[in-house]
Design a protein with these regions (language model features):
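Beta1/beta-strand and adjacent pyrophosphate-binding region of the FAD-binding site
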Residues: 12-24
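Redox-cofactor binding/interface segments in oxidoreductases and associated redox assembly factors
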Residues: 19, 143-145, 347
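N-terminal FAD cofactor-binding segment of flavoenzymes
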Residues: 30-91, 385-393
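A conserved beta-strand/loop capping segment in the N-terminal third of enzymes
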Residues: 70-117, 121-122
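Predominantly flavin-linked oxidoreductase catalytic cores and closely associated redox partners
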Residues: 122-297, 301-302
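A glycine-rich dinucleotide-binding beta-alpha-beta segment and adjacent secondary-structure elements
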Residues: 288-354, 361-363, 381-398, 404-408, ...
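Internal hydrophobic alpha-helix adjacent to the cofactor/substrate pocket in enzyme cavities
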Residues: 361-381
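C-terminal auxiliary extensions adjacent to catalytic cores
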Residues: 406-454
């Protein structure tokens, strides 16, 4: 496969195909275009619709409006710091459209995706094609970033490269409610442990209320439609009813944990708490944190309204379940995110087995950078596993292929420190400092090899 040809002394650059206009595809297209490479960005919506997308915008957030922690001493904060150092488009757009969320970075999802779409449309080197790509291009350089809802035709194409057509799991999405429908007398504002401002609304339950809710939830009618086993769900999007079925207290130690939250009206900690997080700039819509579900909609109405404060809740979006596909990256990909047998073919995003918005975007950055270097005939970059992005890519490309499961950013995937540190906070800070030093070296390397014009 060739992406460039010499014609009359000038280099003619063939466009790189980026297949999929989600978070990873948007980042990959941007990185290529910023380095002088023309891009054809393929997005099947609105021609082909999905069960969870609500607009035609690129980089639409479908599960939650939270991009997780902003704190510098967290794995998610470190990931964001690294992404900003190498020029993330999505983080810039997220900062411009953020809404209050304590120490987390949350965005107005509609404004965010609209801004990303406008930035990509305005770039002179990016052509957005609103059609389904049903086959992998046989010539030139391509990046597959088709995401968790890869169309059946494209997934079969990918499977033919050596993937397994049974590699999939399910994501469940949490419901959203209107703020005006909440009972203000029963909820209170606070962020866990007082971190950040009081950006979350909290619905406290006493023991009796919690146990009645738990009983109804575990007996509720769910949407089947598929042969589903608990192992098919990534733990970060485990349906709340499945968590509840593991035991009476699993919710209290999971999404409904009350620790770090004191009700100012009673000066006491509740038995359990549901948190509501702002989802739009106006503060009119709030999401039920950690309440991804596959309950039938009538059951969601009935059971979730048992929670104090939600008795008259207006659900503007019910929780739903959808299939999330990914390839066996340890078998198929190099740490450059190239396919092992087809070096001009790159992969990025959740289809590689990373889990999370920022994780997907980060792989899009790396795939875009390496695709640009491939076009220019430069050496491709393998990020150090001492960095969070490098550790994430190292994990998905070197894990045991027989039991490969999706992974998100966390300190556990970083190499151990040379010196053992028992204190967790201090240990995490050392991880951050080590990664930042390594990232500075990598950032300089990027600058030395940036392809601006041919």
């Amino acid at each position: 496969m060739q992406s460039a040809a010499i014609a009359g002394g000038d280099m003619v650059i063939k466009p790189v195909n980026v297949i999929g206009g989600g978070l990873a595809g948007a980042e990959a297209a941007w990185q290529l275009a910023e380095r002088g490479i023309p891009v054809k960005l393929w997005e099947m919506r609105p021609q082909i619709k999905t069960a969870v997308h609500r607009s035609e915008n690129l980089a639409e957030l479908v599960c939650s409006n939270s991009l997780k922690s902003n704190l510098a001493d967290t794995a998610q904060g470190l990931l964001k710091n690294e992404m900003e150092k190498i020029g993330s488009l999505l983080l810039a757009c997220a900062r411009a459209t953020q809404v209050p969320a304590g120490s987390a970075l949350a965005v107005d999802r509609e404004r965010f995706s609209a801004l990303v779409t406008r930035r990509l449309q305005a770039h002179s080197r990016i052509e957005i094609i609103r059609e389904e790509m049903t086959s992998i291009p046989g010539e030139g350089v391509s990046i597959i970033a088709t995401g968790p809802l890869t169309s059946e035709k494209m997934f079969q194409e990918i499977a033919a490269l050596g993937g397994d057509d049974n590699l999939y799991f399910y994501d469940a999405i949490a419901p959203s409610v209107t703020f005006n429908s909440l009972n203000q007398n029963k909820i209170f504002k606070a962020s866990r442990y007082g971190k950040g401002s009081d950006d979350y609304y909290n619905c406290p339950l006493n023991r009796e209320e919690y146990e009645k809710f738990w009983q109804e939830l575990t007996a509720a009618d769910i949407v089947e439609g598929h042969s589903i086993d608990q192992k098919d769900f990534f733990s970060g999007c485990m349906p709340v009813e499945l968590i509840a079925r593991r035991g009476l207290d699993t919710l209290r130690f999971g999404p409904m944990r009350p620790v770090g939250l004191t009700d100012p009206r009673t000066n006491q900690r509740a038995w359990a708490i549901l948190q509501l997080r702002q989802e739009n700039h106006e503060g009119t819509v709030f999401g039920m944190v950690g309440f991804q579900t596959r309950l039938r909609w009538k059951e969601q109405d009935r059971i979730f309204r048992m929670i104090p404060g939600l008795e008259a809740a207006e659900f503007i979006r019910y929780g739903v379940m959808h299939r999330n596909t990914y390839i066996n990256s340890p078998r198929l990909l190099l740490p450059t995110l190239q396919n092992k047998n087809h070096p001009a073919l790159f992969f990025a995003g959740q289809i590689t087995g990373v889990e999370g918005y920022m994780e997907s975007a980060a792989t899009g950055i790396l795939a875009g950078l390496n695709a640009a270097r491939f076009v220019a005939g430069q050496e491709l970059l393998v990020l150090s596993p001492l960095t969070m992005i490098g550790a994430l890519v190292h994990f998905i490309t070197s894990a045991a292929a027989e039991h490969f499961q999706p992974m998100n950013a966390n300190f556990g995937i970083l190499p151990a420190l040379e010196q053992k540190i028992k204190d967790k906070k201090s240990r995490y800070q050392h991880y951050v400092e080590r990664s930042q030093k390594e990232m500075c070296k990598i950032s300089e390397l990027f600058l030395e090899h940036v392809v601006k014009e041919f």
